[in-house]
């Protein structure tokens, strides 16, 4: 049963919603995307005074808790200008999108409290197409439990193919978690890819399973 809250905050125009939509494309219905504009629209409350902003905080916190109660990953997409408001979420993963320093909204610029680096887990200061996949695996780290029964899959994965996928499907029937262990092999005709190339390929192909699957690089066992 998953109970994970992810807060993605930053100025208007920083790319929060774009990031969230891409994560949803990857992780599917494991995730509930809680977008601040949609929540305001649902409440029909466009008051951006301090009182109005705090009402919005409470709505967003409640939506995140509802998603958790359903066993979903709560993906909170919110400017979240106040430090004290961010703390209310008690997020398992906090991502700061610092791609925009000042937005087009002067009232938001005045109240936005720029965070200290100790107040977030992950910073995106320039958009990269790999960001959604990277964030999926960051989420996965918060889901993974070392004490949970786990199957280990050991192999070269040069490259990942349908047979590997079929084996993974069988492994997931045996235990709630699977650790895919990539053997570090000497380069050659049978091993055309480095372990880091194999790892990158697996991270892209299996990002939808992050937290159910983990990827480890191990010696030539």
Model-derived segments and spans:
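Short hydrophobic/aromatic beta-strand immediately N-terminal to the Walker A/P-loop
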Residues: 5-7, 152
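ATP-binding Walker
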Residues: 14
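Walker A/P-loop
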Residues: 17
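Glycine-rich phosphate-binding loop used to anchor ATP phosphates in small-molecule kinases
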Residues: 51-102
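Small-molecule kinase domains that catalyze NTP-dependent phosphoryl transfer to phosphate-bearing small molecules
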Residues: 88, 97-144
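Nucleotidyltransferase catalytic core that binds NTPs
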Residues: 142-221
